[in-house]
Amino acid sequence: MEITSKIVLIILLVVMVAASIALYHSMFHKAKNAYDKISFRETMNLAGLPIVTFRQGESKFNFILDTGAFSSIIDYRVLDKLQYTELEGKSIGYGIDGKEHSISRVGIVLTYKDKDYSDVFRVLDMSTSFDALKRDYGVTVHGLLSSSFFERYKYVLNYNELIAYSMV
């Protein structure tokens, strides 16, 4: 009986080790099997920033991926080039001066590789920041995608492969 118990124990250990290796392998290579991938490799190589180009019709719009931002932002200067829906009610924001500001919100649908993405954007004057990015890095930025976007679409940023991916 003792030999049988040892054999069963060894088999169980081998199965557990194999299952652990399989789990590690699937977790490590998740991004390769992701359902949706958004690459930011090119802009990381050029500017050191995670920027993705989306389309609306024939027009292209560049967005910084910012998981730390509270809400997505669109520069007011590009609204005339976009189709959007004005949303009722304003959001409240605070300027660098500490004063409260009323901010317009719009709903925008953008496309990346034949998949549509929608988000709510605060409309702000981003000319100082975005013009500095253009001057210093040579990249035109039209907006910023925030944590709300990543939460809605269950995206994770993978800086090893320079992609945002979703498993849902």
Give each language-model segment a name.
Residues 2-168:
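Pepsin/retropepsin-fold aspartyl endopeptidases
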